[in-house]
């Protein structure tokens, strides 16, 4: 229950991982917070979403894993470490309720949710209100605190609120499902086979006639690839997802099912492209990759949204010439998911440009994953509390995992020229951080074997991130 304070409250809408973390950070900063959660309406006592099973805060609907806890060599483990440094509620409760999972951080999900709920309920500056916020938050009146709001409603945002955001932002700025194509680390692409060229050498807005990476296939390779797509196991939609297909965004395996030649007349068409190494031989099909971030470290497979199970995606896509050793920053998928076009709508402190009283946090911003969602809640909570105190703060530097996520969702992503739908949710990965040169020798001056230099580079990037976060916190 909120106690007397010199500050007006901040309102947080949504009691998932992001909203719970945001509320905690605000309260820990000495600012009262009102957390609105619709999953149990006080008037009816009903849980009113399609996927949740309880009314507990920070309920983990799908997996019980926060993925790798290795801060030295794994980007999500680095994000864990940064959040722990900043007093994360989610990480503290996860550590308290972890279960054996090898190098991963997995939790007893009931114990975890109960702990989050208990800590927030017992905090003297937190008030939890069980209600749905239908539509946009109420207008501020100078006393009610609605001038400082965090929207952390997640992939199951209520229809009324989703429609209100859509009305505010305009058609095309809010997506109701994600159609995710795989993303590949540039350094793992074999450029001895692939080449850069835009179709018909057409220049884009940036004046670049070689904006795509092209991976050629002969007929035999194409036929084998189609066989693998058709045979590969597919993920089924959950009952509550109710995700529609539409022709502009069909999974590649669905296109292949419509006919073996469909893909080579669609996203894999070879027209307007010439292999500079063998210009007289025309490829039977071509897979194109498009730059996905401003750093040029990540490239997405154009038109390759897929429901293939993750276990077979890498194996299948490594059949493509030039991608034999591809390392994936993100695998493909198609899910129900409500998220905004953050690069156009949000500033660097995750405020909506059109209505700065509103901040967005969690999956609704276009991050993917439990940890990433909680991380955005952590930052928005700190931003909102700092604003309430009259001392705004900047985001962490982009060399940190936290800062890299903010940079990506607010500006690091490159639009593809085909509308807002090109922005898709992203997990944390080292490709979002400014690159470093792979070290050739270790701290003792010993030569690092070539195959281990990529791993050594990740450790240097993690060390840089934690050092830069310490400087930001100071």
From Swiss-Prot:
One cellular component (GO) term of this entry: cytosol
Keyword vocabulary terms for this entry: Cytoplasm, FAD, Flavoprotein, Methyltransferase, NAD, NADP, Transferase, tRNA processing
Domain of life according to the entry: Bacteria
Subcellular location: Cytoplasm
UniProt cofactor(s): FAD
GO molecular function: flavin adenine dinucleotide binding; tRNA (uracil(54)-C5)-methyltransferase activity, 5,10-methylenetetrahydrofolate-dependent
EC code: 2.1.1.74
Gene Ontology annotations of biological process type: tRNA methylation; tRNA wobble uridine modification
Residues binding FAD: 14-19
Keyword DNA-binding in annotation: no
Catalyzed reactions: uridine(54) in tRNA + (6R)-5,10-methylene-5,6,7,8-tetrahydrofolate + NADH + H(+) = 5-methyluridine(54) in tRNA + (6S)-5,6,7,8-tetrahydrofolate + NAD(+); uridine(54) in tRNA + (6R)-5,10-methylene-5,6,7,8-tetrahydrofolate + NADPH + H(+) = 5-methyluridine(54) in tRNA + (6S)-5,6,7,8-tetrahydrofolate + NADP(+)
Enzyme class, UniProt record, top EC level: transferase
InterPro entries listed in its UniProt record: FAD/NAD-bd_sf, MnmG-rel, MnmG-rel_CS, MnmG_N, TrmFO
Gene3D superfamilies linked: FAD/NAD(P)-binding domain
Family: Belongs to the MnmG family. TrmFO subfamily.
Record's function text: Catalyzes the folate-dependent formation of 5-methyl-uridine at position 54 (M-5-U54) in all tRNAs.
Protein name: Methylenetetrahydrofolate--tRNA-(uracil-5-)-methyltransferase TrmFO
């Amino acid at each position: 229950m909120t106690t007397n304070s010199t500050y007006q409250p901040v309102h947080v809408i949504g009691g998932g991982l992001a909203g719970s973390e945001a509320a905690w950070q605000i309260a820990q900063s000495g600012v009262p917070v009102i957390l609105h959660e619709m999953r149990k309406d006080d008037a009816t006592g009903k849980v009113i979403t399609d996927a949740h099973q309880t009314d507990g805060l920070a309920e983990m609907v799908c997996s019980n894993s926060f993925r790798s806890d290795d801060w030295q060599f794994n980007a999500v483990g680095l994000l864990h470490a940064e959040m722990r440094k900043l007093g994360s509620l989610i990480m503290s409760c996860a550590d308290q309720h972890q279960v054996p999972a090898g190098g991963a951080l997995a939790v007893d999900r009931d114990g975890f949710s109960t702990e989050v709920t208990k800590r927030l309920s017992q905090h003297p500056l937190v008030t939890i209100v069980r209600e749905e916020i239908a539509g946009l938050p109420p207008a501020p009146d100078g006393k009610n605190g609605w001038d400082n709001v965090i929207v952390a409603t997640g992939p199951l945002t209520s229809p009324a609120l989703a429609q209100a955001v859509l009305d505010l932002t305009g058609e095309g700025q809010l997506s109701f499902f994600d159609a995710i194509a795989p993303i590949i680390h540039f350094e793992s692409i074999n450029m001895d086979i692939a080449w850069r060229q835009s179709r018909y050498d057409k220049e884009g807005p940036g004046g670049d006639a070689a904006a795509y990476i092209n991976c050629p296939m002969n007929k035999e390779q194409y036929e084998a690839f189609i066989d693998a797509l058709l045979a590969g196991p597919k993920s089924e939609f959950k009952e509550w997802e109710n995700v529609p297909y539409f022709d502009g965004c069909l999974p590649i395996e669905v296109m292949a099912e419509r006919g073996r030649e469909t893909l080579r007349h669609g996203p894999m068409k070879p027209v307007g492209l010439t292999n500079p190494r063998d210009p007289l031989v025309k490829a039977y099909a071509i897979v194109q990759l498009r730059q996905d971030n401003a750093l040029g470290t990540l490239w997405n497979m154009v038109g390759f949204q897929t429901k293939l199970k993750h276990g077979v995606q890498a194996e299948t896509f490594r059949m493509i010439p030039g991608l034999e050793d591809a390392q994936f920053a993100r695998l493909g998928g198609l899910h129900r998911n409500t998220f905004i076009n953050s690069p156009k709508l949000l500033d660097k402190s995750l405020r909506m440009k059109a209505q700065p009283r509103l901040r967005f946090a969690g999956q609704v911003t276009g991050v993917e994953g439990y940890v990433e969602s909680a991380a955005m809640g952590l930052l928005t909570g700190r931003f909102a509390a700092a604003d309430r105190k009259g001392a705004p703060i900047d985001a962490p530097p982009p060399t940190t995992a936290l800062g890299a996520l903010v940079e990506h969702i607010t500006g690091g992503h490159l639009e593809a020229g085909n509308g807002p739908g090109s922005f898709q949710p992203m997990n944390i990965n080292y490709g979002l951080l400014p690159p470093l040169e792979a070290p050739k020798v270790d701290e003792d001056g010993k030569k690092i074997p070539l195959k281990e230099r990529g791993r050594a580079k990740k450790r240097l990037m993690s060390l840089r991130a934690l050092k830069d976060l310490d400087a930001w916190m100071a």
